[in-house]
């Protein structure tokens, strides 16, 4: 999810030497909206999330058990008024969770996966 706080900052995770947005796999019986909110909560520790509009779908490949897999990610706009401490889901390889400004993201675009950066440019001023 693309989560914005009241300061206009966006929630990012840092994993595998890259900035990324929280996301994950849909569990059986879940709809996409429930999955999106649950994954943000699990990966970041953020509570009090308000789900907004669907922003689109992106695709990327990754290796799983030696095979290339294609993953579709359904992105949603979200917001939160929470000021509580964030908790990275370390078992998922997430090293830290931070609220970042559009200015910071513009200055650190090399730390963002190219496919995600392309998506972010459509929705943020970076």
PLM features per residue range, with description:
Residues 26-113:
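Unchanged
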Residues 111-126:
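Charged phosphate-binding loop/patch that engages nucleotide di/tri-phosphates or the phosphate backbone
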């Amino acid at each position: 999810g693309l989560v914005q706080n009241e300061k206009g900052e966006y929630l990012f995770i840092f994993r595998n030497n890259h900035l990324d947005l929280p996301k994950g796999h849909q569990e059986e019986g879940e709809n996409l909206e429930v999955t999106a909110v649950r994954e943000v909560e699990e990966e970041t520790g953020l509570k009090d999330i308000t789900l907004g509009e669907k922003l689109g779908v992106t695709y990327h490949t990754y290796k799983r058990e030696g095979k290339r897999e294609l993953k579709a990610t359904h992105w949603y706009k979200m917001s939160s008024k929470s000021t509580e401490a964030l908790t990275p889901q370390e078992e998922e390889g997430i090293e830290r969770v931070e609220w970042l400004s559009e200015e910071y993201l513009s200055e650190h675009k090399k730390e963002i996966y190219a496919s995600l950066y392309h998506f972010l440019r459509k929705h943020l001023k970076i």
